[in-house]
Structure formats: structure tokens, C-alpha cells
Amino acid sequence: MSTALFLSPHLDDVAFSCGGTLARLKARGWKVALVTVFTRSVPQPTGFALACQTDKGIHPEVDYMAMRREEDRDFAALMEVDSLVWADLPEAPHRGYDSAAALFTPPREDDRIGAAVVERLAPLMNELRPDLVLAPQALGSHVDHVQVVRLLPSLGAWDSRVLWYRDTPYAVRQPEARPDPTLPGDLRPVVVDVSAELRRKVVGCTCYRTQVGFQFGGAQAVGPTLAAFHQREAAAHGRTGHAEVLLAGAGLDPALREALTDE
């Protein structure tokens, strides 16, 4: 059985960005691992870190990340994920990024999280030996996404097995956003028809109850927003229906492309 490892900076990124591809591979008999990097609960948060939960109506005494991990567990159950892994590392607001604007600046010189990410994920990669790795492009340049993208080569992920997904909803809000400049330069689009999986993707996204208000304007807006976005993505590549558009190197194994696109 083939294995796909979906690498998510935060507890929602894979669902929002490539949940349709996840559902498609699962329906085709693949084993799916969902690995999220920044998932740690930090006791008694203050300042901007605390504001990230109180501005969503969550009281200061509540363990915000525990709520989010429960949402991730709900998504994994719905999508029949085989392996759900949390790397238990702190999000950027707990690493000195003290404002919303700071989240979208280049990594700080004193932010040494990359080494910790490699330490947590390298053994997992060796254990799972995934046939396919899906990782973010870092559209929007959120520092946590950038850190994940830039450490990927240290995990031994080969170009022939990596697909980079379009970080959503950044791709919705910033359609001209470019991938992180450290990605390989010879990437080509892989257009995955997710028309049949779109409804399931939408339901999966609504599992992230603490996030859909901020990211989409409410649970009721998730479906229309994603339907319109994925229709535009398909049309931009001369297709009908709804598509998630990934990037792959020229050396992508043809069998992997066929599993995703039937081409």
C-alpha cells in the first residue's frame, strides 16, 4: 500500500489547502499520514500569543491549542487518516513574533525552530518511508510556513516524491502570491480534479471550528469560498470542474502523477 505524508505547519493548513487531494488518495487505497508541526500548548500565554485566542472569543484560561488539536482529531476521523502526528512545537507567537505583521516577516535570526523540527520529523520520515510528501509552498509568507518549506531538504525528501500545495486561504486572498524562493526552479503544475471530493473537503474544513470564522467569515462561507476558488484554479489551467493545483519537479514519478490525475 502506498503512503502519502501530508505536512501541515498548523492545525488546519492541509485541510484548507489540499483536503481534496487527501480525500482522493484515501479513496484510491492509499495510506495517509497527517503530520502537523506547530501544535504545542503553552501555559498562561500573554501579549500577542494570548490575543490570538481572545480575538476569536476564547477565554484566556482555555487551552486554545488543546481545542485545536481536538478539531484536528475530528478532521482526521472524518477523512479516515491512518496516522495523525503532532510534532508538539510552539507556534510563532510563542517564539518572539509579537504582532500580526511580524508573522509575515523573514525568520528571525534567533528563531532556531528549524533544527527542532528536523529532530522531530526526521525519525518519522524514516519510519513511514512515504511514497509521496505534500508540503506547503509558503504562499503568503507566514513565518511558520516558510520554516517548514526551508527545512524540507534536511528531511531527505526527494524531488521525485514531493508535491507543494497552494497555502489556502492565502491563495484565495492573494492570488498573485508566489512560492517561497527556496523552492526548486523547475516546478510544474499538477492539476488534481477534486470535483468529486469537494463536498467532503468542505465538511472537513468546518471541523476547525475555532478557525473558520477568522479565515472564511464563518462556517457557512467555507463551501462557497472554496467552490469558487477551486473552479478558478481549474479554469486557469484549461479544465472544467474544481481543482487543487500542486507543484512538482520535472522528476516526479509518473506513477504518482497518474495516481493523482489519471493522466
Report the location of each language-model feature.
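Active-site beta-strand->loop->alpha-helix modules in alpha/beta enzyme cores, enriched
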Residues: 2-158
